[in-house]
Amino acid sequence: MLLIDAGNTRSKFAWWDADTDKIEILGAIPHQSWLNDLSQPLKDLLLEVVSSRQLEREQQAIGCSVAAVQVMDTLNSSLAELGIKVFWQKTRAQQAGVTNGYTKEPERLGSDRWMALLGCHEQVKQNALIVDAGTALTIDWLMADGRHLGGWIVPGRQLMLNALGQGTANLKGITVNDIERDGLAAGLDTFDGITQGAEAALTGAIAQAIQLSGRYFSDQPFDVVVTGGDGEHLMRTLSVEFCRYDDLLFKGLRLCADNLNS
């Protein structure tokens, strides 16, 4: 089954083989790349998946999305052309042994975070601090018994750089790709000051979360579970032991797929 993670800035695709219970990461497409030239990059990837997996018409897919409406329209139309029916998953108050910490408005928790919580609970099976460093840095506390204790949302590295570029006259044009990552240091020019400041903000948030975890988990052991493209670098800057899972969200989608087929 095709698994889809439609994020803020790119969509990621994976394949779940129900016979072997293996998840294979297929790739990712930045949204800007396919919106600029309609949906050709997306269609190319989907056609490759359909042909290589020998999918039949009316094949099912399952996904979650925090993407913009325009992106979702492109995704849905491209998938429909190939006869792929997508079951988009929503956040629930309780599912697969996990209880949503957003008790007043559970649906306000992003479905990407919810899928990661489901995947973490199934994979880790103990207290976990989940650090997902993508477009935004999200941090969630999850008890071994499945209780979600809440979390934080922090602007990611590129969002911080963009905010400075938009809000000031002379600080435009810095991207994550420009940054040389050698750990924290005092900036000796404006460029270094900005990039090191972003690094300090992100690692500082994670460090505070780790410190709070002792209280939230009643001084019981916990794992630091890391996902997202920037996560491993940030953790190494902090010199903290962690477990990395590139497919955490897809593991959550796989659990939902099990329910579709049951």
UniProtKB/Swiss-Prot annotation:
Location(s) in or outside the cell: Cytoplasm
Keyword tags: ATP-binding, Coenzyme A biosynthesis, Cytoplasm, Kinase, Metal-binding, Nucleotide-binding, Potassium, Transferase
GO biological process annotation, one example: coenzyme A biosynthetic process
Binding site for substrate: 102, 110-113, 190
Principal place of residence: cytoplasm
Keyword Protease found: no
Record-listed K(+) binding positions: 132
Subunit structure, as described in the record: Homodimer.
UniProt family annotation: Belongs to the type III pantothenate kinase family.
Function: Catalyzes the phosphorylation of pantothenate (Pan), the first step in CoA biosynthesis.
Protein name, UniProt field: Type III pantothenate kinase
Biological classification of the source: Bacteria, Pseudomonadati, Pseudomonadota, Gammaproteobacteria, Alteromonadales
